[in-house]
Amino acid sequence: MARVTVEDCLIHENSRFRLVLAASKRARQLTLGHQPLVAPENDKPTVLALREIEEGKVTVQGLLDGQDVSEHLARQA
């Protein structure tokens, strides 16, 4: 898969600053051992986080509100 960029994710969030904050929070979670919600494909945590946001697996608002990813998944089910 081609690398995802911040610009690719701006359809989910208008503020580049909020998007980068959310992606960095998710990347930190992945670094600490949380399971990725997309296939890793040898990507670094920051790229995985952006891919998860771009694919709608996690939301910027949810990450910034401090919601655990498992809470987000439970509400989607």
Curated annotation (Swiss-Prot):
GO terms for molecular function: DNA binding; DNA-directed RNA polymerase activity. InterPro entries: DNA-dir_RNA_pol_omega (IPR003716), Pol_omega/Rpo6/RPB6 (IPR006110), RPB6/omega-like_sf (IPR036161). The keyword Signal does not apply. Belongs to the RNA polymerase subunit omega family. NCBIfam families: rpoZ (TIGR00690). This is DNA-directed RNA polymerase subunit omega. It comes from Dichelobacter nodosus (strain VCS1703A). Keywords: DNA-directed RNA polymerase, Nucleotidyltransferase, Transcription, Transferase. It catalyses: RNA(n) + a ribonucleoside 5'-triphosphate = RNA(n+1) + diphosphate. It comes from the Bacteria. Its EC number is 2.7.7.6. Gene3D superfamilies: 3.90.940.10. Promotes RNA polymerase assembly. Latches the N- and C-terminal regions of the beta' subunit thereby facilitating its interaction with the beta and alpha subunits. One of its GO terms (biological process) is DNA-templated transcription. GO terms for cellular component: DNA-directed RNA polymerase complex. The gene is rpoZ. The RNAP catalytic core consists of 2 alpha, 1 beta, 1 beta' and 1 omega subunit. When a sigma factor is associated with the core the holoenzyme is formed, which can initiate transcription.
